[in-house]
């Protein structure tokens, strides 16, 4: 049976009035899923690819709703939730996965059954929990090169061990994953393999059950990767049906991501319900370099620095009162992001510009982002076959930004707060360096619908939401 998360409970996917594709751990193992991109081919109306010019940055779309940008301040249209924690940026999302309990892909607007609202849909990633019995698992795989004249082997090692630390009170789990990929392509400009990547993930989890009605589940993970930049093919040079690539800047991606979550579940007699609290923290430090023009010439090369620090908390209650299933909750999210972009373009120096100064493009931005949300939904059974769906959400968002235009200027860093946002550009007379701004938004969004069970195996449903 494939299940999906509805409210705080787990239900058969056939009974949930949401367009959802769910994968349990056995299915994920059978499909050999090691990243989200792998699921694009098993899910209708869903694309989980990355942005071609920025490795690891999500370009997710569901039912045609998505974005195609590496700018981290653009909010995700498709929300990614890891162990119930919303990931606030697209950067550092398309990365390796292991030891998964389930993945659920929800199509359409979300926001009444869990914290953050999204317009295109949501991807719910649930990593493996500690077990009350001793278990271990290890796997080693080697993928050989497809062709003798390009690429190298792709080797993956992973292991998990789980079991009770204090019987009936405390369970623990530890997992480690390492991938060494020699690359899939050959760079014809240098005769080297292209696409090399090293990735290491270490994850620990503890589950504490002080009483029969109270459970704490904490997880901590560190993700590090070092790889070449994106593998771009310029079709003005090579046929699109070939694997030929020639670039003079193989680029790089350096990622260091720390993630933690703490989930608390308290069973209460009120409505035979559950109070759930989910706290999440994520910190990202990333640097990149990419050959955007995808040629052996220096026409457009780009580098970036990116940092993110986010904190979130979601508190919700889910219970049943006679014919009504009720979910209510509140959500708080805050993040600080900083992004520096550097561009190497073959632009002509102005006449008289000193040869001792670098003519390079620098700029970027910093953003403080805060979100509050209150949400609720009631599923009321009019009959044994017909259920009404009624929901309401209030959301408030605030953004505070400092921007430095990406223009020729002395070397600076938004991450290190050395790029000016006021005054004028010393390289271009009269041009402002940037600006600062602040704005906020609030909205009440309703949801109404009907669900009808024709048979035990067939349902019809329709919903309206703003």
Task: Identify the function of each model-found stretch.
Residues 207-211, 317, 323, 331-333, ...:
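Structural signature of Gram-negative outer-membrane beta-barrels, strongest in the C-terminal barrel
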Residues 3-18, 22-55, 68-73, 87-95, ...:
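N-terminal plug
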Residues 142-146, 178-182, 220-226, 281-285, ...:
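Transmembrane beta-strands of outer-membrane beta-barrel pores
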Residues 136-140, 174-176, 204, 218, ...:
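Membrane-embedded beta-strand positions of outer-membrane beta-barrel proteins
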Residues 33, 165-168, 179, 209-213, ...:
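Outer-membrane beta-barrel channels and translocator barrels
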Residues 191, 195-327, 333-336:
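Outer-membrane beta-barrel domain signature, strongest for Gram-negative TonB-dependent receptors
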Residues 75-77, 89, 98-107, 112-187, ...:
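Outer-membrane beta-barrel translocator/receptor signature
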